[in-house]
């Protein structure tokens, strides 16, 4: 740890790379909203802001029961201030992500030291899946910040204000993802108290029961909304049946139902899913993370007294999500602040010249080179005739080489070099993705392109859509987007011509049913969330593209 405090230049390097980490995340603000989930959530919040109805959630022009309300409230509030646009959608999520970074720093500083806090913040800012989630915005940035804030106040704040602030953050987190997230927090604190012989004292502390009671009180807005939209109206058709309870779904079906695969939304679980997912999701720090967790497991088996809250929360999340039958890579984002702190604390204990630091320095150098080479490879695949991305990559790579080979002249020690060079390589990759890569591929989000055409040429005219739907069309269109079925559309077309956005297959079906169809325009389409190497190659891309059509439909 002395390596980080002894250099007078360390703080300057830290500030520069922390600013770079923030910047590359902010660069995602100018990108379009990704389909399907991001654009779906943006559209739900759009309807909330436009209608002034902050109680009911709707998608596809029908009642929607899946995620809780908190992210939609924050997004709708942002729309009310900044207008309905992609930046306004992403801004509140970025605020909560930044809050997660702030609490990562504060938590590490309180539990360990200032150098550990600085390294933890750099790891947090440059962890791959956090950067991806700030571009493909869903609920995770909100949850990450709220989760870290709740744990900080319950672990470190003194007095009753810590209990109620932590309860407020935890309640907001529950109203973002569900009651299930309370389990790893409780498990983490129980482990800490048990190992340190404080279990009886903690369980008889009225503050903890006060905090849990306040958490239950603070989630009442969510329960009231669910009751008003669903429990009060058992006649509503949800998940193909009536009598669906929103409150039951919130407490059981959306959480334990997914875990046990008994709810309306099902998946296929793999107990090793997150073991290999973290290898790429926590890049470029994943190897160091696994090493730090192995060290914590050894200490756990020895029952060493000390700080165990973060380890307990992290391991319980890992085990719970691994046992679940419904799994997605971004589920682990919520413990990335704690992963960052554990990794930083373990890393700062390595000493200059010892074999493990030498080995991990070589590992991180290899990972950094792979990241830089990956950027150049993407440029060669996609931009071989455009040299602006290459100039950016060469300049950043030159800086990385200079830092690695001339570190002593910059007052940078071995551990500092490992941390700074890894962070710089990660920032290079993320800058390339947000400046060049995402804007290029998002041109093939056909719904957004169709909405742009409609806003310019047929402004204010409602457009119908039949499956497959486009959530980006719904969000970016200034006019209403009406979801319907083919039979209903033909009935409407008998009265007046209608605008329709749809696929080639649906267009052919309409023609087979003797409808009069005029093609107004067509738009190249590719599901951006399911990238394949062939799509990235310009000469192979046409064979991967589908097309969506703007049609005027009349009944003959």
Q: What are the roles of these predicted feature ranges?
A:
Residues 2-5, 14, 160, 164, ...:
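Membrane-embedded architecture of ER/inner-membrane glycosylation machinery
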Residues 109-111, 150-163, 173, 347-350:
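Membrane-interface transmembrane helices that cradle and orient dolichyl/undecaprenyl
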Residues 44, 157, 181-304, 309-346, ...:
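Transmembrane-lumen/periplasm boundary regions of multi-pass, lipid-linked membrane glycan transferases
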Residues 120-121, 156-171, 312-314:
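Short hydrophobic alpha-helices at membrane interfaces in multi-pass membrane enzymes
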Residues 132, 163-177, 318-322:
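Membrane-interface alpha helices of multi-pass inner-membrane proteins
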Residues 129-142:
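Short acidic/glycine- and proline-prone juxtamembrane loop motifs at membrane-interface regions
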Residues 103, 142-158, 339-342:
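Specific aromatic-rich, kink-prone transmembrane helix
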Residues 91-111:
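Transmembrane-helix motifs of polytopic, lipid-linked glycan transferases
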């Amino acid at each position: 740890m002395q390596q980080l405090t002894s250099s007078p230049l360390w703080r300057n390097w830290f500030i520069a790379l922390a600013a770079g980490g923030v910047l590359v995340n902010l660069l995602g603000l100018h990108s379009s909203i990704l389909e399907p989930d991001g654009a779906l959530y943006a559209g739900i919040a759009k309807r909330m802001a436009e209608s002034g109805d902050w109680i009911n959630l709707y998608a596809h022009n029908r009642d929607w029961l899946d995620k809780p309300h908190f992210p939609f409230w924050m997004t709708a509030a942002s729309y009310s201030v900044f207008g309905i646009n992609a930046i306004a959608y992403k801004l509140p999520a970025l605020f909560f992500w930044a809050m997660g970074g702030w609490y990562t720093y504060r938590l590490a500083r309180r539990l360990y030291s200032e150098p550990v806090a600085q390294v933890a913040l750099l790891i947090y800012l440059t962890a791959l899946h956090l950067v991806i989630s700030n571009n493909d915005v869903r609920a995770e940035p909100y949850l990450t910040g709220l989760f870290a804030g709740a744990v900080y106040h319950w672990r470190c704040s003194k007095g009753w204000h810590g209990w109620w602030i932590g309860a407020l953050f935890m309640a907001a987190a529950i109203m973002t993802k569900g009651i299930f997230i309370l389990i790893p927090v409780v498990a983490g604190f129980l482990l800490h108290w048990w190992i340190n012989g404080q279990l009886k004292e903690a369980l008889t502390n009225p503050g903890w029961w006060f905090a849990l009671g306040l958490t239950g009180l603070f989630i009442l807005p969510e329960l009231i909304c669910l009751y008003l939209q669903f429990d009060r109206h058992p006649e509503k058709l949800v998940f193909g049946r009536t009598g669906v309870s929103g409150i039951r779904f919130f407490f059981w079906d959306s959480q334990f139902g997914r875990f046990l695969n008994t709810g309306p939304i099902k998946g296929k679980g793999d107990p090793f899913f997150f073991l290999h997912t973290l290898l790429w999701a926590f890049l470029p720090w994943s190897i160091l993370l696994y090493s730090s967790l192995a060290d914590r497991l050894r200490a756990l088996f020895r029952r060493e007294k000390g700080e165990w809250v973060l380890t307990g929360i992290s391991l319980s999340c890992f085990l719970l999500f691994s046992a679940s039958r419904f799994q997605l890579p971004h589920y682990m984002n919520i413990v990335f602040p704690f992963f960052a702190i554990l990794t930083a604390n373990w890393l700062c204990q390595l000493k200059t010249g010892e074999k493990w630091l030498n080995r991990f320095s070589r590992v991180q150098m290899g990972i950094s080179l792979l990241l830089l080479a990956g950027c150049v490879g993407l440029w060669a695949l996609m931009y071989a005739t455009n040299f602006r991305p290459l100039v950016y990559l060469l300049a950043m790579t030159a800086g990385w080489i200079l830092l690695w080979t001339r570190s002593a002249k910059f007052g940078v020690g071995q551990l500092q070099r490992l941390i700074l060079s890894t962070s710089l390589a990660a920032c290079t990759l993320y800058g390339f993705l947000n400046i060049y890569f995402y804007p290029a591929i998002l041109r093939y989000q056909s719904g957004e392109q169709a909405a742009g055409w409609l806003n310019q040429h047929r402004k204010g005219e409602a457009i119908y859509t039949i499956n497959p739907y486009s959530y980006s069309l719904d969000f970016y269109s200034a006019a209403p987007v009406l979801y319907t079925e083919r039979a209903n559309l033909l009935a409407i077309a008998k009265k007046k011509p209608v605008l329709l956005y749809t696929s080639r297959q649906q267009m052919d079906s309409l023609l087979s049913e003797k409808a009069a169809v005029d093609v107004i325009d067509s738009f190249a389409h590719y599901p951006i969330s399911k990238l394949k190497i062939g799509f990235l190659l310009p000469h192979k891309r046409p064979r991967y593209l589908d097309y969506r059509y703007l049609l005027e439909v009349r009944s003959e």
